[in-house]
Amino acid sequence: MHGVSGALGWAVSPAVLVSVTTLAGWRQALLVAALIAGAILILLFVRRHVLLGTDEQRAHEAHIKKNGSPFSLSFLKLRTVWLCWGFFFLSALALSGVQSFAPTAMQILYDLPVALTTTAYSSYMLASAGGMFLGGFIAARAKAPDRIIAIGFVTASAISVLISLTWVSGSSMMSLFTLMGFCVGISGPSRDLMIRTATPKEASGRVFGVVYSGLDSGLALGPLLFGLLMDWSLVPGVFVLIAGFLLSALLTAYRVGENNRTQQLKNTSI
């Protein structure tokens, strides 16, 4: 559900902030964004007891800390942790291209107005949310999450390259871009399941913290790379690079899946 809610937030934010900017100016739009963030912070504080868990859960965590977990930092030596980090990093690079540069690139390549390209981005994120919802049911039944990711990412990469070639009309491109979002979204739950399988139970929180830092790193670096392509007037390269990052992320997911299957075979044979 965290993935679905995040995708919905990304889908709604352009419409909300662009509308406020048009009606009242960019300063008011920033104020609205700050007020929303502040409201969420207040909600988290008021409902903090839900996040802290039950007394039994807190007692169990205190017991583990008291006795010292063998996975305090040793999880950093696990190859799968860094493969998962690489997956998040590369997929975040692709996401940064979609978020920050794909609408502008579509505007240039297909001669579309800003309103339509912004709508295309919102449709991408809404489809991504729908894909995540459906992907949750698929991941619950899948024995190999990395293969679900492969199907989604390969299809999304092919669509991204097709968009870069400008072989289709503007309306068809928007439909394809929406389908691309659905394909990426349907892989989300399988991604989380893959990481959970590769994570030591005693260090799950720390592993997810390290792995998710790859998301922030990718979102920070991506605009620099895609911005260079735009500065060099290599606009089709935006979609080609998005496809390249998705396929590179797929390779790391495949390696994680292979490691998980190997470990499961070892555990079965013991």
For the regions a language model picked out, list residue spans one by one.
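Cytoplasmic membrane-interface "Motif A"-like loop-to-helix N-cap segments
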Residues: 141-153
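Helix-loop-helix hairpin linking two adjacent transmembrane segments in secondary transporters
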Residues: 2-52
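Extracytoplasmic gate region of multi-pass secondary transporters
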Residues: 80-125, 129-132
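Juxtamembrane intracellular "pre-TM" segments in multi-pass secondary transporters
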Residues: 52-83
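C-terminal ends and interior cores of transmembrane alpha-helices
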Residues: 155-168
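Intracellular juxtamembrane helix-capping segments at the cytosolic ends
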Residues: 186-199
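A membrane-interface helix-boundary motif in multi-pass transporters
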Residues: 22-34, 228-245
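Helix-to-loop junctions at the C-terminal end of transmembrane segments
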Residues: 132-144, 230
